[in-house]
Amino acid sequence: MEFLEYLTPITSHQWGIGSVFLLISIPLIVTRLLTTFWSWRELSAANQKAPGQKRGPTRPTTIPLIGHIVSFLLDGPGFLYNTARYYGRGIPVRVHLATFPSYVISGPELVSAFLKDSTRSLTPMKRSLNYMEHAFGCPHDLVKSFATSDDKDMEQQIHSALQNMLSGPRLGILSERYQQSVKSQVLSVDAGIGDEWVELPDLCTFVETHVFQAATRTIFGPSIVDLNPTLAKDFWNFNKRVKTMFLGIPAWANRTAIRARDDMTEDIKRWQRHAEKNCNIDEIPEDVEWEEYYGSKSTRIRQQLLTKRGITNESARAAENLSMMWATNANSIPAACWFLLQTLHDPLLQARVRKELDAVRIHDTEETNKAAAFKFDITGLTESPLCQSVYAEVLRLGVAAMIVREPTHDNLALGDWKFKKDEFISVPTNNELMDPDFWNSGTPKDPHPLDKFWADRFLVHPDDPQSGPRKDAKKQKAKSDGKPYFSMDGCTWNWIPYGGGAHLCPGRNFAKREIMLTSAIMLTAFDIELLTDTLPKHDKSLFGFGTLPPIGKAPCRIRRRQL
């Protein structure tokens, strides 16, 4: 009797746990079964429709009400990679990411049609306005000021200001100033690197801090940096938390991120007030390409166009300036860090890269500081085969953005598929950048998996028909000198770190120069030895918004290099 009494509480306790388990698991199982049935029903219905009339199925889910957001937050790249293959590439699959339902599309036919947007029927406007408000801090009642207006000429002028800054002669002027600014910053007394070895706890923190300041001085002028001693720290703190604001997490549940954004907008407002007080922007001569209050001519023009558009509220202007600052730093600087880390990690690659850099390095006769008496032929640098291949591979491996558009009219056809007005359509760039059916992954004797860095992936060796970026590489005409050369032939709709087609990033040419010049200057100005055999991983927590920065530290020792 006593034995049975002893067992009773245990049995009751076990049944209690079992009941809780059943209460939790039954809704999950039922949800999975129902959504799987419905998904297959949608796919079956699509297969019976004519081309141009098919509707994509919804991916099954397990958790009721909240959709796929948990899977996305746990492993965004893996979730979207598997989504694209759930029914096979080329079939759009609908997912629900909290307040953001979207069709995920993949495959060359759909992706090229989406990016080309030949009928100009896709727009990023709604998401852009969402980002302007929630991520960059534009007041809610003013955010529509940034929407397309009836003043088409004004829209064209704003777009033209960006295009002119980042292409043609102005690109060359801006790139030369950037080169000088980075050199001055990293070789300054404040940087703390001399002729003797010093140890840094993290190479990337050094690069992020000093290159951000150099880039910001180039684009916005020196005042914004001088007025805000913590600007670099504030920016990277904001960048670390920006994803939660992009996703629209309510402010009451996201106070740390909101504080980080507010720190940045206050820094920018301080600069705006200083510039307005000390400089009459309308009196600056048209031919002045750069001055100390507003920096580049493009920044100055953008401020004038905002005024003409009626956007005079300082918070709204600070939001626009923060969006520009984020766009010009948050992707290119982490990419430069990866260029450096991958090069320094491989002594043979480092020697090959430095050989190319030496070939395009010239003596800077105007520089009085002997350690900085060098500069690069920027055209020669950006055409260097190996350096270009390293650059392209860094972006292929590290960029994980979501290109999001929505149809401007009902029944938009992309390939065989139909989309309704205002439905979000997304291309996760890493799905195409990591496509095993497209990219060259080496040979059985010399494999180079797509999730591993391969410096030569974009080089064509004339004597090796299996070289080059594509798995199905066609025989390419060899150059007369017989040397390896950089190639992107046939990669237009797979190598898409900058998007493509109608909405190709206008800053891509300057970003390439930022990444390559930063890396070239660091490798030329300094001897750098990594103090770890293992490189950091990509920070997948920032998936969806551009270049994934390193997570963890890369300790090193560094000294000025004797040229």
From Swiss-Prot:
Residue intervals passing through the bilayer: 10-30
GO molecular function: heme binding; iron ion binding; oxidoreductase activity, acting on paired donors, with incorporation or reduction of molecular oxygen; steroid hydroxylase activity
Pathway(s) this gene product operates in, as recorded in its UniProt entry: Secondary metabolite biosynthesis; terpenoid biosynthesis
Stretches assigned to coiled coil: none
Matches recorded under Pfam families: p450
Similarity annotation: Belongs to the cytochrome P450 family.
Amino-acid positions noted as binding heme in the UniProt annotation, renumbered to this chain: 505
Assigned EC number: 1.-.-.-
Major localisation: membrane
Keywords: Heme, Iron, Membrane, Metal-binding, Monooxygenase, Oxidoreductase, Transmembrane, Transmembrane helix
Alphabetized CDD domains for the sequence: CYP7_CYP8-like (cd11040)
Lineage, opening ranks: Eukaryota, Fungi, Dikarya, Ascomycota, Pezizomycotina
Membrane topology: Single-pass membrane protein
Keyword Transferase: no
Protein purpose: Cytochrome P450 monooxygenase; part of the gene cluster that mediates the biosynthesis of enfumafungin, a glycosylated fernene-type triterpenoid with potent antifungal activity, mediated by its interaction with beta-1,3-glucan synthase and the fungal cell wall. The pathway begins with the terpene cyclase-glycosyl transferase fusion protein that most likely uses 2,3-oxidosqualene as substrate and catalyzes glycosylation immediately after cyclization.
InterPro entries: CYP450_sterol_14alpha_dmase, Cyt_P450, Cyt_P450_E_grp-IV, Cyt_P450_sf
Name the UniProt record assigns to this protein: Cytochrome P450 monooxygenase efuG
Annotated localization: Membrane
Requisite cofactors: heme
Gene Ontology CC annotations of this record: membrane
Region annotation Disordered: where it falls in the sequence: 462-482
